[in-house]
Design a protein with these regions (language model features):
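Short, flexible, mixed-charge acidic loops at enzyme active sites
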Residues: 118-127
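Structured beta-strand-rich core segments of catalytic domains in phosphoester-bond hydrolases
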Residues: 4-5, 10-13, 17, 23-118, ...
Length: 243
């Protein structure tokens, strides 16, 4: 969350305050007990225009909490966590009450490759020439991520309501994880884009699409695109749905 900067100096929070979105779904949210860093109460106050919230943290210790957060202008009910045998990954589920309709929301942060800075630089510069350690990390993370995705996909398949699935899937659009979700869900970006790349993560001159807004709604979204913003290594993804 902007490297845990205070709200007054946090580019991510400033962007969210100005977004005028009805629903904010955040992953990798860091809040601290130490008031020199961003605290949970400070985050709530900075986004107090949203009366309904859901905080779902995976990592707890005496100083830091880390996980997902949802801020909404619509009521959130039936909140629960989908946990994995992973120290830093989580999926959060809740139902959004939009007028007389109910939408089931899945906010996700799936397994990453956990590359060091030098490893990431190497992969982005030479994606087809990686060393043994990098290959092992890719294989291990891909397997873990697909297991996580199967757990979420099972919940999606049994949802009694239309589904909105968002977040950092750490998966390319040709990956098994992405294709598993596409068995049941539409990709809002593909439905509304016109030859745009849609990169949501950038390192140097290379960008990739690993963050998504997937859904089982009708009608289709009127817009879905990454938004240029600072403060994070991921670009925020914004979509508009009209009932």
């Amino acid at each position: 969350m902007g490297q845990a900067r205070k709200a007054s100096d946090n580019a991510v929070i400033k962007f969210l305050q100005q977004s005028d979105a009805d629903l904010l779904c955040l992953q990798e949210v860091d809040v601290y007990k130490n008031p020199e860093h961003l605290t949970l109460s400070e985050l709530k106050n900075a986004l107090k225009q949203y009366p309904y919230t859901y905080f779902d943290f995976k990592v707890y210790n005496s100083r830091r909490q880390f996980g997902n957060a949802v801020f909404s202008r619509y009521p959130l009910v039936n909140k629960h966590t989908i946990r994995y045998p992973s120290r830093a990954n989580i999926s959060s589920c809740c139902d959004i009450l939009v007028g007389e309709d109910t939408v089931r929301l899945f906010t996700n942060h799936l397994e990453s490759y956990r590359f060091t800075t030098s490893e990431l630089d190497s992969v982005m510069a030479h994606p087809f020439h990686t060393d043994t350690i990098i290959r092992q990390k890719v294989l291990s993370a891909s397997r873990s991520r697909f297991r996580q995705a199967r757990i979420v996909a099972d919940s999606v398949a049994t949802s009694p309501y239309p589904v909105l699935l968002v977040g950092d899937l750490n998966s390319l659009p040709v990956s098994p994880t992405y294709l598993l979700f596409r068995l049941k869900l539409e990709d809002a970006f593909l439905q509304s884009s016109s030859l745009r790349l849609g990169n949501t993560f950038r390192k140097g001159r290379i960008g990739i699409r690993i963050d998504y807004i997937l859904h089982s709604f009708f009608p289709t979204p009127t817009d879905c695109r990454p938004v240029q913003a600072t403060g994070s290594d991921h670009l925020p993804l914004q979509a508009t749905f009209v009932w």
